[in-house]
Amino acid sequence: MGFITKAIPLALAAASVINGAEILETRAGVQTLADKYIVVMNDGISDKDFDSHRSWVNRNHRRRLIRRGAKAMGGMKHTYNFPTGLKGYSGHFDEQMINEISKRADVKYIERDARVQINAIEQQDNVPSWGLARVGSKEPGGTTYYYDSTAGEGSTAYVIDTGTDIQHEEFEGRATWGANFVDDMDMDCNGHGTHVSGTIGGKTFGVAKKSNVVAVKVLDCSGSGSNSGVIMGMEWATKDAQQKGADKAVANMSLGGAFSQASNDAAAAIAKGGVFLAVAAGNDNVDAADSSPASEPSICTIAASTEQDSKADFSNFGQVVDVYAPGDSITSAKPGGGSQVLSGTSMATPHVAGLGAYLIGLGKGGGPGLCDTIKQMAIDVIQNPGASTTSKLINNGSGM
């Protein structure tokens, strides 16, 4: 997820309150998207009042375009309505329109939309992996993955990423497309999402080899996207999981960016909706407290370990990290067949999402409480984990 070192000055950057809504500060290192915003409504706003607010925004935006000769803007684009209560929208507005919105008493805060990206940092083709064996063993250096034959059967993993090659032989027909918030191509043109999905539910590379995988595409071929688009994917996954049984669902987000209150609130809404969510800590070797959605306390934040049970040199750290998982030189599926090796907290996170699915298959309780279960099962082995950071490494409880 790394910060992109480009600070963009903006008249609205400083946090302020104008007759109601707070315009959140844009932190240094955030790659904001020009004239694009995320607006979050007050807690508890009714559907009727939310509809009324959106109608007001659309009317005023049209008037600005037609009557005032305002610079052409796209207006409202995405609407968010999580089943757990979080409501908001994103869009393309000029500064005057945003100032009008900020004066509304029904708006909680406004945030600049910003760029997010995947957390893989390197690749190497066709070398053996070690992560699975480590998850199933109390000692390092093993070559066998010990696991219960239930293998996550009956669970569903939502992979919020670049998409998944659902035809890959690793998934044996258990992978499906859920939603696409990027383009009209239901394919993984990057490879990151397929790799992540394989670590969760692949027949060879997966922690939960019988789990179902649902692709939720929020990142493009370069592995990049926006907070507003990612939040759309988070909302869709929450609603779909609740329809099918949230207690049987896990979600994986091997992505992120600089701190975003909207991104954190959306992650919290997933957890509140009863879905276990694993999120990458990030790859900048800094405290993950300044990263989102990794800094949201109600989810499970994952740092990356090496084959030698040490912190990977790229991995973020800090009190927000819940547990370590293998993330250095991990082999998994690639689009079109075969495998590739990637490193990053992106690769660590699906080991934990997969472990959550595996535990659901064993009959353990689902939901955000799975993070506590995983931490209780973890082993205290990570060397030099980083300041104020746990030294716990995940374990499935099956090995020697």
Swiss-Prot record:
<feature type="active site" description="Charge relay system">
    <location>
        <position position="192"/>
    </location>
</feature>
<feature type="active site" description="Charge relay system">
    <location>
        <position position="161"/>
    </location>
</feature>
<keyword id="KW-0325">Glycoprotein</keyword>
<keyword id="KW-0720">Serine protease</keyword>
<protein>
    <recommendedName>
        <fullName>Subtilisin-like protease 7</fullName>
        <ecNumber>3.4.21.-</ecNumber>
    </recommendedName>
</protein>
<dbReference type="GO" id="GO:0004252">
    <property type="term" value="F:serine-type endopeptidase activity"/>
</dbReference>
<feature type="domain" description="Inhibitor I9">
    <location>
        <begin position="36"/>
        <end position="118"/>
    </location>
</feature>
<dbReference type="GO" id="GO:0005576">
    <property type="term" value="C:extracellular region"/>
</dbReference>
<feature type="propeptide">
    <location>
        <begin position="21"/>
        <end position="119"/>
    </location>
</feature>
<dbReference type="InterPro" id="IPR010259">
    <property type="entry name" value="S8pro/Inhibitor_I9"/>
</dbReference>
<comment type="similarity">
    <text>Belongs to the peptidase S8 family.</text>
</comment>
<keyword id="KW-0865">Zymogen</keyword>
<dbReference type="InterPro" id="IPR000209">
    <property type="entry name" value="Peptidase_S8/S53_dom"/>
</dbReference>
<dbReference type="InterPro" id="IPR022398">
    <property type="entry name" value="Peptidase_S8_His-AS"/>
</dbReference>
<keyword id="KW-0645">Protease</keyword>
<feature type="active site" description="Charge relay system">
    <location>
        <position position="346"/>
    </location>
</feature>
<dbReference type="InterPro" id="IPR023828">
    <property type="entry name" value="Peptidase_S8_Ser-AS"/>
</dbReference>
<keyword id="KW-0964">Secreted</keyword>
<comment type="function">
    <text>Secreted subtilisin-like serine protease with keratinolytic activity that contributes to pathogenicity.</text>
</comment>
<keyword id="KW-0378">Hydrolase</keyword>
<feature type="signal peptide">
    <location>
        <begin position="1"/>
        <end position="20"/>
    </location>
</feature>
<dbReference type="GO" id="GO:0006508">
    <property type="term" value="P:proteolysis"/>
</dbReference>
<feature type="domain" description="Peptidase S8">
    <location>
        <begin position="129"/>
        <end position="400"/>
    </location>
</feature>
<dbReference type="Pfam" id="PF05922">
    <property type="entry name" value="Inhibitor_I9"/>
</dbReference>
<keyword id="KW-0732">Signal</keyword>
<feature type="glycosylation site" description="N-linked (GlcNAc...) asparagine">
    <location>
        <position position="396"/>
    </location>
</feature>
<dbReference type="Pfam" id="PF00082">
    <property type="entry name" value="Peptidase_S8"/>
</dbReference>
<dbReference type="InterPro" id="IPR037045">
    <property type="entry name" value="S8pro/Inhibitor_I9_sf"/>
</dbReference>
<feature type="glycosylation site" description="N-linked (GlcNAc...) asparagine">
    <location>
        <position position="252"/>
    </location>
</feature>
<dbReference type="InterPro" id="IPR034193">
    <property type="entry name" value="PCSK9_ProteinaseK-like"/>
</dbReference>
<dbReference type="InterPro" id="IPR050131">
    <property type="entry name" value="Peptidase_S8_subtilisin-like"/>
</dbReference>
<dbReference type="InterPro" id="IPR036852">
    <property type="entry name" value="Peptidase_S8/S53_dom_sf"/>
</dbReference>
<dbReference type="InterPro" id="IPR015500">
    <property type="entry name" value="Peptidase_S8_subtilisin-rel"/>
</dbReference>
<keyword id="KW-0843">Virulence</keyword>
